[in-house]
Every structure is written in C-alpha cells, then in structure tokens.
C-alpha cells in the first residue's frame, strides 16, 4: 500500500485533528499515528497539550502542534497554519471535525472525519450540534463511522461518502518496569475494601450521559445481598459531588475512585464490569477491555454495544435500573454463566479488527484520495 504523495516526490503528509476529550478517540489517534509513521507517512497531530502529555503522540513519531479544544479564531488560525502543505486532514470527533472544516475553508485539501461516538446535548445546544453534524457531514470528503448506526446517521445528515471504520482497541502502553510494579489483584481488592465480597467496576466521566444515576439506583438492590457487592467507579467529572451525596445519603455500596491510571489492573481484579450507559461511545473501551481481560460484562443496550459485544455480555434495556440490578445479581449467582461469558468474550474479541488492519484501512482511504486519477 502506498505511503507517497500523488507526485511521488515525498512521503504523504497527514494532519490528525483531535479535541482530546474522549479517551477512545485519543488512544485511536495515538495508535494510528504510530502505524502510519511506521509505514513512512509524516504525521502531525493537532491536539491540546494535555492530550500529548497523556498519549505521547511525539513518542509515536508524530509532530505535535498544540491546538486548544476551541473553535475561537486563534485556535482555527493555528490549525489552518498546521494544515498548510498537508496532503490530507483527518479529524476525529464532531468538534474537532468542525474546527477542521473552518480551518480548511477555501482549500481543496481532502478532509476525512471519523465519528467515534454521537455527541449529546439538550435544548438549544442539541439544535446546534445537529447543525454542526450537517455542516461536517456535507463538507467532508469521506466520513468514517465506528458503527453502522453512525454510518447511517452520517448518510442521513448529508455525507457524500460514508463508510464503516475498522477501529481496534490499542494495546496498553506500558512504561519501563510497569509489569514489576503491578500489585496483585488480591492487594488491589484489599485496598478497595472488597475482600470476601464481589467487586464490580465501572469506568467513565461523571457526567449526565454515562448512566451513573442508573448505577446508583441499581445499587440500592444490592444492599440487601450477603455479601454486599462493592461497586467502584473510575472517572472524574462535574456530577461527582451530586453522586457522592446520594451515595452517602443512601449508604450505597459504591466508591468513586476519581481518575486512575491503573484501570487495567482494577479491571483484572474485578468480578464484573458494568456499563450502565454508553455516553454516546460507539465502541466502549471498557467493554473491549473487559472482554479481552475475560471479565464478564453487564451493559445497557446503548450506542453500538450489541454490534460490539454480540452475545458475549448480559445486555439489558437502557434506563431500567431494576433490570440492570437483576442482571448483576443473576450473574453473581451463576458461575457457569459467568464462565460462558468469559469464553464467548474471548471468541468475540478475536474477531475485532487489529491495529494493523485499522491502519491499513485508513491508509487505503488516504491513497484513494491522494493518488492521481486516470484520465478518461
């Protein structure tokens, strides 16, 4: 597969545009950048500085240009300058895509956008998001959706060319000596107060779209179990104080852990992974990590969950805390079902795209858009 510009004089130069607000898309861009650089593509990642601090795009061989997560004139001008002489621009997420549309105004540079999830908003902001979606979909040369639902949405919104994207779960990046410093699961469980009781884990920013309210409502049911399961939630966000008040006021068996950099280790120590709401995330990172780690998953049917996990999880209707609570209780009481889900999860995960396949698909789109077209 080619990695050269249409003129064959120098290697293809791409600009990846990222808002930095979504862990899944940020990890995807890091993985994509590493794969493209390894294939001879020059990659510039335009993202907030904190995103590079976390995901180390420069360590993947890309150039990082700090562009704030904003559509103000200064940010758009910085992005426009970074896109000068780019063979193509690839933006990830709705807001980053809209900034790219503004920055490329008047230029003929091909624009690829990947929709990793569906943006959520209410009231007047919801109307604004629909307008942004329409502008981005109609302007982009190609829209890649990470689920068939997102591809259909892009087409309905006016995309000229919408395709299903192969998006792999990037392998965890380990720092030197990381394995030696990993605490055993028993130690983590003891630190969390989960010895002699089931440990359930959820991950996600503490906002209104992650289903944490449903999770707390379900936890009321679990108070009556013996032993009482402990639910831990890794993540931070604007609803933390409100959720903590409910936990304290109702004495719920839930701990908010805040931001953690050991989510993989916590998940390996858990008996169940819980996904009470997708938050618009089409390919839930937690769901993928749970199946890879052979941790049974209970999830609500939101976003692209069924398409992602198939029959390898307990799936319940959204907005139904009683059904969610019952599914958790059933699974904790049925070790044979839990073991079956582990095996089904391993099988399901084996069919997901690899990082190499993800890079190959993206590079084929790049080549399609930058290679000279035959004269007819």
What residues fall within each predicted segment?
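N-terminal strand-loop element at the rim of the active site
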Residues: 11-12, 16-74, 150-153, 237-238
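Short hydrophobic beta-strand element within catalytic cores of glycosyltransferases
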Residues: 296-299
């Amino acid at each position: 597969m080619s990695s050269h510009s249409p003129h064959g004089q120098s290697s293809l130069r791409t600009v990846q545009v990222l808002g930095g607000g979504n862990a899944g898309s940020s990890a995807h861009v890091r993985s994509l950048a590493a794969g493209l650089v390894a294939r001879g593509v020059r990659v510039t990642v335009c993202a907030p500085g904190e995103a590079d601090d976390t995901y180390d795009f420069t360590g993947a061989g890309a150039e990082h240009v700090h562009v704030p997560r904003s559509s103000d004139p200064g940010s758009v001008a910085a992005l426009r300058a970074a896109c000068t002489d780019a063979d193509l621009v690839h933006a990830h997420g709705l807001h980053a895509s809209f900034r790219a549309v503004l920055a490329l105004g008047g230029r003929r540079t091909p624009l690829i956008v990947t929709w990793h999830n569906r943006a959520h908003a209410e009231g007047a902001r919801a109307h604004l998001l629909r307008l942004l979606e329409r502008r981005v979909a109609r302007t982009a040369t190609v829209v890649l959706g990470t689920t068939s639902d997102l591809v259909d949405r892009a087409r309905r919104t006016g995309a000229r060319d919408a395709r299903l994207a192969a998006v792999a779960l990037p392998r965890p990046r380990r720092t030197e000596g990381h394995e030696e410093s990993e605490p055993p699961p028993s130690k983590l469980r003891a630190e969390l107060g989960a010895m002699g009781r089931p440990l359930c884990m959820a991950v996600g920013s503490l906002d209104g779209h992650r289903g944490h309210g449903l999770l707390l409502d379900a936890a009321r049911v679990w108070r009556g179990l013996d032993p009482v399961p402990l639910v831990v939630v890794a993540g931070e966000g604007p609803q933390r104080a409100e959720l903590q008040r409910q936990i304290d006021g109702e004495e719920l068996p839930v701990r908010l852990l805040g931001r953690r950099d050991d989510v993989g280790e916590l998940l390996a120590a858990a008996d169940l992974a819980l996904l009470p709401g997708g938050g618009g995330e089409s390919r839930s990172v937690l769901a993928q990590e749970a199946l890879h780690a052979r941790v049974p998953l209970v999830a609500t049917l939101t976003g692209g969950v069924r398409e992602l996990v198939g029959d390898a999880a307990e799936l319940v209707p959204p907005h139904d805390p009683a059904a969610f609570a019952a599914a958790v209780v059933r699974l904790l009481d049925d070790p044979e079902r839990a073991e079956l889900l582990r095996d089904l999860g391993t099988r399901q995960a084996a069919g997901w795209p690899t990082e190499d396949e993800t890079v190959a698909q993206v590079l084929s789109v790049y080549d399609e858009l930058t290679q000279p077209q035959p004269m007819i």
